[in-house]
Amino acid sequence: MPKMTDAQKRDIILEMLHQRDAIKTDEQAVRKMIDERLEFVPNKKLYKFRRCSIKNFKTLEENCIWMPPANTFYDTFDCTINIDLQRNKRDIEVWLREKYPRLSYDLARGYCESHGVEMRQTFEDMVEYLQTCIDSNGDVIEEKEAAFLNRFVTAEERELLEQSLDSLIEIRAKFMEYEDAMIQVVHEAIEQMRTRMRDAMLVYCMAEHHDIGSLWENYADVYKGFCIEYSFSDYAEKPFEDYKNLVYLLPITYRARLPYFDMVPFFEGVIRQGIAQDTSWQRDPGLNADLNMQLYYKKKEYAFEREWRFGINNKGNCKQYFPFVSALYAGKDMKPGNLRRLCSIARKLRVPVYKQVPNRDNNGFDYEIIREENV
């Protein structure tokens, strides 16, 4: 079974972003994407481990799942953005040095246009002006400025040019003065986005296998709970509303060191929005893909989970119909009353129940089907 690479995952996310509206209603497009996704799911089955509780039994009996908000996860770094402010500060300084003049020019031109002033100079003219007419303290070298102006305009036109140049100098000085403060503003914006992402997402996590001891111990009450098997082999035979959320299903990538989110595009976008009210960066597919990729990384110590997950917007709709249950597995130490309840639910759902028992060599588990007469 091939593993989905990060490059493949990013391409999938980009496709979903490009087809954001289509995947809400286009059944053919959604089925195509789900089919491609399931090629990476072993046997097209995934598993969920649960404790025995009234809520969990009721949700299962109704053929539903409970999708908790990401902000309830024990791992505070899950479903969030991993940044390195100090490392990105160097990258941002490079950006300021290499791309700042273009941003300054664009902002100055926008400022002039909004004030009815024609900006006749090209970007190259502005670069030359900044390099030759402004000293290291940001002050104008008047004699060089005069020489520069005389090359472009008549005396009558000079006042208009000075207005455009003054606006450029004003913006440039402001940026230079508050450079560190802007980096902090971006950092705070990312922190707000981290919180918003965890608050705004409902997430359902599943595993590739049912025989994972750590999951039985951590999520199934140390073998006293149960495991739900979901099969997606015949998902397309069900109504579109029942399977449409599977389009968001993706695997987790486990890393010893979590990849950092590159703040530079975010930094530029926040600055453009703050100064020029340009919000186009928020719709940039590449930036949004990189943000979404951050939701599918976890530390390597969680690799035993072999997790897949999908998320939807948090609209208070934690309970979702999910009619894909194909089998149930009872933990070896499940109490008799809970076992009877699980078997009753299995009859209603028309799926088999297996009981976890030590194997003959006593070094693992077998899963034996439970007959009704034995319950």
Question: Which ranges hold each PLM region?
Answer:
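Partner-binding and oligomerization surfaces adjacent to conserved cores of proteins
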Residues: 2-375
